[in-house]
Amino acid sequence: MAEKRNIFLVGPMGAGKSTIGRHLAQQLHMEFIDSDTVIEERTGADIAWVFDVEGEEGFRKREEAVINDLTEQQGIVLATGGGSVISKENRNRLSARGIVVYLETTIEKQLARTNRDKKRPLLQTDCPREVLEQLAEDRNPLYEEIADITVRTDDQSAKVVANQIVKMLEEHIM
């Protein structure tokens, strides 16, 4: 790939966006950025704190500003937050400014990958499965709407998924 286009990873929490993104960036010799990490750096607090103090709406405003800034860069692999696609502005920017890769996974895999993670405000509930099912119902069509490439991440290592994405990117660009 001569041209270093942006690659934006979307998908639900626990799909592997950050882990796969790091492998992908390394393979493609691109910079890896996690939008949630940038939000935390700019805020000086973790995502859970932002949710507690500003609510989801306050967090989404911050996320929209960060995604706008990051998608204007060139040659990056960006792992977005699971809810970033809620914003039509974000969906438009992601679609227009790079190749969108949707990382699909099952609710079971999400539960297994997130069950000990206390940094996921939406899962701090007695019924995380119900939350994930509702999020999937609401968000999966939005991921599909903007995806240029879709990859299932369930039973493969992050490195294998990254390899698959590289092959698909080569086919997509040609």
Swiss-Prot record:
Mg(2+) binds at S18. Its cofactor is Mg(2+). GO terms for cellular component: cytosol. The keyword Transmembrane does not apply. Its main location: cytoplasm. Its EC number is 2.7.1.71. PANTHER family: SHIKIMATE KINASE, SHIKIMATE KINASE 1, CHLOROPLASTIC. This is Shikimate kinase. The lineage of its organism: Bacteria, Pseudomonadati, Pseudomonadota, Gammaproteobacteria, Vibrionales.
